[in-house]
Amino acid sequence: MLAEDLNTRFASLSVLLRAASALALASAAWAIALPAHAQASAASGEGPAQAREVRAWLMRSHEAASHRNFQGTFVVSGGGAMSSARIAHFCEGPNQFERSESLDGQARHVYRHNDVVTTLWPASKVAIVEQRTLIAQFPALLQAGDDRIADFYEVHAQGVERVAGHEANVLVVKPRDGYRYGYRLWADQASGLLMRADVLGEHNEVLESSAFSDVVIGVRSQPETVLAPMKKLEGFRVLRPTLTPTLLATEGWALRQPAPGFRLVSCVKRPLGGVGAAEGGAAEQQAVQAIYADGLTYVSVFIEPFNAHRHTRPMLAAVGPTLTLMQQQGEWWVTVLGDVPAATLRLFARGLERTKQ
């Protein structure tokens, strides 16, 4: 029962963040981290010409994740585990198309057309179709937080290194407190595409590394390779989880003290009992999910009714940089999840209060 509750239910969300969406997320982070870098440059005596050069580099990295066509093999390692996937991204005007196929463990194919994501599990013949508006908006939400980045992170350029056969500029992002992790990022010099991203612990150790082992940039756009499998679902049991916008106050909750720098960016209700109800199925019990972001990373708070059969004991578990804190709070079961230190999760959990019975 340890990781079989909300962790399992939202596994596909984590996979997407770790793979295809990781490119856009990290690239967006580079773009919004610029104010901190500008301050660091001024303090170290770097001139305005160099600051402008870094600004252009960061913005190009952000644009590359959204507007470049590329395909390659993406590898994620951390916590003694490693996984890989074949990833392709195509852009035609305002439309974006992505596909990700796992190369390890159980076969899993993920296809995205803008904010519609279809996940196929060939072995079990299950298809999950989701309107992942939250995921699609994450880069924009993070960019909106650029006024806070300099307060909580320092950003520095750190030379050039080679990744997957490409010369890449290196950026180091250091936290100013103990409530968040640091990052080291690599971007292709020619295109700006993010090539590698490391999550760094408090002692500068690598908690997780996500990188291309091979990638071809500028490939021909092939949206049909994404759209066709999204439509061909014969023989699959199709599940369509739905997200319903809400507010913590509406659900009878309040967060009195989020970690410094984190702001609420979304609050929804989503179905329990697996990833959702099958087409035409009855409505299921729901969990409340509130997402908080500091501009570079996020924390999710899940609240569901306590169930003694499923919620056997409190726990704190780690998978790479992702920590999960689960505990009972009265008649409720609270799960706090994020790529942040344990102190951050505990602060969120302590600040959560029930405002109505």
How should each PLM-predicted stretch be described?
Residues 12-26:
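Sec-dependent N-terminal signal peptides
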